[in-house]
Amino acid sequence: VRPLVVPAAVLLALTGLTGGAHAADKPVKRTAQCQGDWIPGTPTADDVMKGEVSLVGLPPVKLGKKINWDASPYKNRSWEYVFHSLRWMGTLVVAYENSGDDKFLERAKEITADWWRHNKPGASKPYVWKDHPVSLRTQALVCLSMHVDDPWLKDSLSAHAKLLSTPSLYKKGHNHGIDQDIALMAIGCRYKRSDWSKLAVRRLTETVKLDVDSQGALREQAPRYAVYVYGRLQVAMTNMRECGIKVPGDIAGRAESLKDFIAHSTQPNGYMAPLGDGSAETEPKMETGTPAQEVKVYRSGYAYGRTEWGKPDSAYYSIRFGPGMKYHGHEDHLGVTYYAQGRDILVDAGFHSYERSKYRYWTMSHEAHNVPTVVGARFRPRTASRLVDSSLGKDRQAYELTDQAYGVSRTRKVLVNHGEDIMAVRDGAAGGKKVRNIWRFADSLTLVSNKGGVVVLGDGKFKVALVQLSSSCRPLTGQKVERGGKLGWVSPTYLSRKPATVVVSPAAADVLTIVVPGVEDPKVSCSGGKVTVHTADGAVSFSANLI
């Protein structure tokens, strides 16, 4: 790869800017480019001054005075790109603005100048100049430029702007594109390059309309990224106002609509449903307000429901369908999660990391989710699925979904009853094919018993039962239960891997699964096309067809 050469004609409009870091007259002016929530919580400015950085939650690394820019102490891709984003350097500039102490600015300048000497475009590792590190690094460089006028910094920002404005490198309809536009606009506003600022606003408007649909759902297939996108759009709109640019209505409107989506994607315990590349430890630290409805179906592929808002012991579920897997999505179509009586019941395997490992790719697979599989048929990745019917009552909701991910129509019907908590699921496939389904329970729940088509799990006094019936309403026996092994794993936090109990049904033409929280010995009966289940709070009856 040839090093990027920036011709003089492309350089920033640098009229009259000369000199280096200067001793500040206290107090130092605090700038909009440096203040804000873009600075990471770790490392602190004092940590950086000591030559020690802690990134992406991993243990601190001693960088020393002379930094090795090829360092990769954990062989972790996220660590590498955050290292080269230089946001940790930005903590020094913020400390300088807040304290007036020149030592912070001098070290920030020293670090950044050294980085630029060793990491010219085309002369460093390719990931250093990929779209996201470039975008995030720009914020730190623009912040530094508010106090350092050296030509090398202007050259660096010009190189960043050239990449950020290159059409073939732009990630349209994705959170990376949003960050690219924020970065390009920051440079354009800093140096009065209206061509860059206008390009950034035009692209951002188009990207936001692609990334956030008209209902407010994020299309990246991992709801936790909606929190990130919402925060970044607040930054973008603030920067526009600071730059004298009118905020387009489409950007403001779509950003506001994300609040309801984030609220519906958040479980009663305050943590987001860990769908796609979403960790179970994601807690939206933002005010979303309380949506008017307890149940919401998003055309982009989500159905959410809960008993009521504001109560941690409310029941809650998620159901996935929609466009085939892309961006931060997993092969979770027709999958469900379930939370009841103040705890997780059914969970996905979760998000482990972005490392290229077998385990990472397994967590994205259909086997890592609560889905039906078609026996003897090959799974076809990235297949879209459809919600074909729904019945949305206050205390009971039912859904019917279908796709051809196995080359034949597979169908899942889901019924959730609130108050007397149950989730009932009916799975089948066309063409006489048999199905087998997978149920992954929260890692705190361990096997108590497995007999007669009833699997009971528990955590201390709390019990939950899984009952499986055939199309004739007879017990379906022969469940396989494993903890660990091939299927029995979850990743509740970043880079963690814990054993969890997984129940795999026997193969059958039609499988009715009933999950009953809070019950150890559920009584289930069938009569006249209806199924009656005795829960901890009373009996529940529903059509054997569910919908």
Region annotations inferred by a language model:
Residues 137, 306, 411-414:
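Short, cationic motifs built from Arg/Lys/His that form the positively charged side of catalytic pockets
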Residues 185, 213-347, 351, 393, ...:
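Carbohydrate-active enzyme catalytic cores, enriched for enzymes
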